[in-house]
Amino acid sequence: MMVIVPRIAVVSCFSTTPFIYGIQHEDNLRAGLLLSDPAETIQAFSEHKADIALIPAAAMPSLTDARIVTEYCVGGVPASKEALLASDDALVGAWKPFGKLPCAFAVWAAHADTDPDAVEALQHALTYRLEHGYEAILESAFAADPGRAYAELAHFDYIFDNQKDKALKKFWNSGLKAVPRANPG
């Protein structure tokens, strides 16, 4: 019996450090991890070089066969968005008119034919991330000042809840377009 290892594409940047850590350290998730910039992540997913990907939210409507699959995202809520909205990121800038709404900058998407067991294992890996955020910093490029890095992560809200889902659908329906940067920093 041949085991098919899912391929997971993730943007390699500060805000995804905990997710990457969770994927790398969850014993029940056997997956190939593709680290790249936002445009390459979208391309890998579009070309089926990735089964699951952390996709910039603005790109989701343009992807065929993509569905949001986990309870996690890279997002923010009104109380934490002040720091995020100071960024020069295109999606962050496009979100400014929606300033009172929570936002999801990136969501976990999978193709319709992705093995449900792989999605469940990813969900467990991301939950592991929630429980080991500080350890993720210690093993990252941001370990030089772990206290500051951990405090910076507090600006993000990683739970994809009903409010973010509704806000994201409102954003998509507004017709605003945002092209992800090639290098998120």
Locations of regions flagged by a protein language model:
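Domain-level signature for soluble enzymes in the chorismate/prephenate branch of the shikimate pathway
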Residues: 1-185
